[in-house]
UniProtKB/Swiss-Prot annotation:
Note on how the cofactor is bound: Binds 1 [4Fe-4S] cluster.
Protein name: Ferredoxin-1
UniProt cross-references to InterPro entries, sorted A to Z: 4Fe4S_Fe-S-bd, 4Fe4S_Fe_S_CS, 7Fe_ferredoxin, Fd_C, FdxA, RnfB_subfamily
Keyword RNA-binding: no
Residues holding [4Fe-4S] cluster: C21, C40, C43, C46
One of the record's GO molecular function terms: 4 iron, 4 sulfur cluster binding
Length: 93
């Protein structure tokens, strides 16, 4: 099992999840974060930290697309280990 970042993160990027991840498995794109599925240890501490409710366990239904997105982009986006400010317009999304 792994956790998956879903569409609710797009344009939000609050990054509270990054601060609590014990294995630094988050990767940052321009508009969202993703979780590297092979690095995630399934601890679940990130899920309740996300104010956008964008993080879900991959055991939930209909997450195949987002699991693929996370796996693909985690290979190329830079690793993020410290929280940054959310975009100024994050609350609009």
């Amino acid at each position: 099992m792994t956790y998956v970042v879903t569409e609710n993160c797009i344009k939000c990027k609050y990054m509270d999840c990054v601060e609590v991840c014990p294995v630094d498995c988050f990767y940052e794109g321009e508009n969202m974060l993703v979780i590297h599925p092979d690095e995630c240890i399934d601890c679940g501490v990130c899920e309740p930290e996300c104010p956008a409710e964008a993080i879900k366990p991959d055991t939930e239904q209909n997450l195949e697309k987002w699991l693929g997105v996370n796996a693909e982009y985690a290979k190329t986006w830079p690793n993020i280990t410290q929280k940054k400010d959310a975009p100024a317009d994050a609350k609009e999304f």
